[in-house]
Amino acid sequence: MIYVLAIIAFLITLILVPILIPTLKRMKFGQSIREEGPQSHMKKTGTPTMGGLTFLISIIITTIIAIIFSDNANPYILLLFVTVGFGLIGFVDDYIIVVKKNNQGLTSKQKFLAQIAIAVIFFILSDVFNMIHFATGIHIPFTNVSIPLSVVYVVFIVFWQVGFSNAVNLTDGLDGLATGLSIIAFAMYAIMSFMLGNNAVGTFCIIMVFALLGFLIYNVNPAKVFMGDTGSLALGGIIATVSIMLNAEISLIFIGFVFVAETLSVILQVASFKLTGKRIFKMSPLHHHFELSGWNEWKVVSVFWIVGLITGLIGLWIGVH
């Protein structure tokens, strides 16, 4: 059944992308490129965006099929909720951007509040489905106060899901970069899931891998379509959710190492400039630094993929031990 689901996910995306591209062009849903970004990217202006819709539709359809034939639908329902929730936030953001014809979509506050809401609802659903197990609470020394660990864990879930959702979004700045790294991440978690005996999560990860492979064909340099926030916010949220459902959160630091590095480069760049007036990198996120250092786009993407694969294998080892 897994092989059938993989083929279905791949074919749906593969078929949908060439259908969506002319539709997006006709509706003038093209990407606006930041003027302060690398000048080599200006030629990408107008490239159709919101392509993440294709693999999200593929994932939703294929996961529903998996639910129909599954004895345990709860993991699929949780993952489907996160997929739709974060994907919807990205879709609204993309829609506002293409309508306004600039790179200002939802405000940061609006986006964060929506992401937090999805993360909190995920926690509640996980508790209802009895899929999250935690101790009674944490006692604060020298007091009679005890903080329920569920409160601590919900804060962690919010941080993890929202953080990685935005991390993948920051990484999605070069053709095929975020797509390829996400394929690697889901492949690692698919292997981990089956090794840990969590077949439902493993099957979902396989669906993710093949849905994204169908998209990568059109997203690799020179990209014919971008996934947009519709795709990137969803991917980050899903990857974090998978790590949580496998109780392998720490592994994500390695499996998602490039995403973490990209995010840290932005944080360090902003902090350094505010504190010292100097920049650490030529431009952030990190992939732009290497571009401005003379690397062509394909070299940056290839090296980052290789790094992602190596650290992903380390994360896999950590997750199963």
Curated annotation (Swiss-Prot):
The keyword Cell inner membrane does not apply. Signal peptide: none annotated. Its EC number is 2.7.8.13. GO terms for cellular component: plasma membrane. It is found in: Cell membrane. Keywords: Cell cycle, Cell division, Cell membrane, Cell shape, Cell wall biogenesis/degradation, Magnesium, Membrane, Metal-binding, Peptidoglycan synthesis, Transferase, Transmembrane, Transmembrane helix. The chain crosses the membrane at residues 1-21, 49-69, 77-97, 112-132, 140-160, 176-196, 200-220, 225-245, 250-270, 300-320. Pathway: Cell wall biogenesis; peptidoglycan biosynthesis. This is Phospho-N-acetylmuramoyl-pentapeptide-transferase. The lineage of its organism: Bacteria, Bacillati, Bacillota, Bacilli, Bacillales.
